[in-house]
Amino acid sequence: MTSEALGTSRIVQVGIVVADVEATARAWSQLLGLPMPEIRLTDEFDFARTEYQGAPTFARARMAFLSVGQVDFELLEPVGEPSTWNDQLQQHGPSMHHVAFEITGMGDKRAYLNDQGLKLIQSGEYVGGRYAYFDSQARLGVVLELLEQDRPAEGTDEATD
């Protein structure tokens, strides 16, 4: 069943904040019998334009993705500046951080969640799309993330562009 409010029922990601992304990725890989994922660093501020609590931040994270069925486990090791990832790690230790829904119409969905009393805590860009985290911990037990992927322009071949 599709959520009319978010326009999707597709959970695409479970985010886990960790102190050591390599060790945690190795442990998950061994447990699930999956290959060790690539560890990469999120984009720099000039591209990502990350905002935390309404202000620009140079926050980054070392990250790895493990695909399990149609859901990715996203492992995030905070690097540096203030972020929701740092807050989670400092307050709760390694723990589940977010559940992500893939959506279209980021502006409308952000406004809807704001109207529902959920405060935007962090947002940014990445190659191929954008994300927004909402402070839903007290109400839902987890941070809510919206992910919007860029769509290829009509009439273009995604494989060659």
Regions found by a protein language model. Name each.
Residues 9, 57-59, 125-127:
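Short solvent-exposed loop/turn micro-motifs enriched in small/polar/acidic residues
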Residues 2-5, 11-19, 63-72, 74-77, 88-105, 107-161:
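Vicinal oxygen chelate
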Residues 34-87, 130-151:
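Conserved short beta-strand elements that form part of the metal-binding/catalytic scaffold
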Residues 1-6, 86-92:
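Short, flexible, solvent-exposed loop/turn segments with mixed acidic/basic and small polar residues
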Residues 24-25, 62, 109:
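Residues within well-ordered alpha-helices
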Residues 1-50:
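Long, hydrophobic N-terminal alpha-helical segment
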